[in-house]
Amino acid sequence: MKRSHLLSLFLIGCSLSASAQLSKPQVDLPDPLLMNDGTTRVENLADWTIRRQQIGEMIQHFGIGQKPEVSPEAIKARMVGDTLIVDVTVGTETLTLSSCIRYPNVGQPPYALMIGTSMLSLPKQLFESRPIAVMNYNEAQVNDYTQGRWRPRHERGEHNFDRLYPHLKDNGAYSEWAWGFSRLIDGLEQLGPEVTKIDVKRIGVSGCSYAGKMALFCGAFDDRVALTIAQEPGGGGAASWRYNCGVDSVENLDRTDYHWFLESMREQFHGDSVYLMPYDHHELCAMVCPRALLMLGNTDYRWLADEAAYVSLNAARKVWEKLGIADRIGYSINGDHGHCQLPESQFPEVEAFLDKFLLGKSDIDTNNILIAPDHFKKTIDLNKWIKF
């Protein structure tokens, strides 16, 4: 199994030169292109690879907890019919993941694959005429926390992940869910396209709401994902913690679900202390670079904090622009539809990203898919937040 492409991003014991909060408050967004030494700036993809690692370390250290690496020998994958089963063994403990792959009725294998975090919320008609397989990632097999009571759930430190990594019992769910997602891709790689009928170079991930956040973390922390579509991810996803500080009726750092994050994040960065945070979520978005990212918003739900996401995405776009690949990031923010109910008006943006980044149609134009309400553009001063 090829592992070099994972950049050794998230090894246990990786040093954190930015393991402390900022020495003084910074209201505007931290520069994603500035290295931890405070002087060196990213000039090319090689530099960005290093900077991306630094950002990933900060997000784990302060925000979600560690996403541990797994040796290839710990993975044992098999197909039972159309179901992918992956056993992950760490020490004496084994965790089993299973996900059914639904293959398209058009095209020839190996197929591109879109993985839905928890479930694929994008409308099925987007896939019916495209040679893209779909699969849902059952995150409860790793960490079964849910805000609702529609299924039994365990508390922090009691999940299946914690059997394998008891020393990481304080982790937030998003690090653990991202870990499990990566193990599914490990399984696909191990078996190969002859067995799975999947092209692992054309994998996408998408989810909505809490699962939109999950999709963003999964795509950011695994560079084998070609396309990330984060649908209505809200605060803790694409939205800037800084922008949301003190804003009423939105999900901000003081009003999020801390089963998802490290409790220490709230202790360190509550209230105005958020301005001491050495990163923000425009940098989580930027971690997807140089791959493709599309964010879908819904202004009908103020809790989703789309204004803050608008700021974050424009800030993150600076990284793609620096590398000359700004066609790989876009956003589409509108309203007049239900939560996680993608309207037909947003189909063209999604179709363009699917066709270009999963199906390889290079003639598709994804430049300047930057769709937001006019009042965002008129009332939000991007220069106040983006000074790099």
Predicted regions and their residues:
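Hydrophobic beta-strand anchors of alpha/beta hydrolase catalytic cores
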Residues: A112-M114
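Alpha/beta-hydrolase-fold catalytic nucleophile elbow
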Residues: S206, Q231-E232, L296, N334
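Alpha/beta-hydrolase-fold serine-hydrolase catalytic core, especially in secreted/extracellular enzymes
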Residues: Q21-S98, Y103-P109, C289-R291, N298-F388
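Bacterial Sec-dependent N-terminal signal peptides
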Residues: M1-Q21
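Mobile cap/lid helix-loop segments that gate and shape the active-site cleft of serine hydrolases
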Residues: L227-L284, A305-L313, E321-A326
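Gly/Ala-rich beta-loop-alpha elbow adjacent to hydrolase catalytic centers
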Residues: G207-A211, A215
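Conserved hydrolase catalytic core segment
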Residues: F221-A226
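Cap/lid segment of the alpha/beta-hydrolase catalytic domain
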Residues: G116-K201, G234-Y243
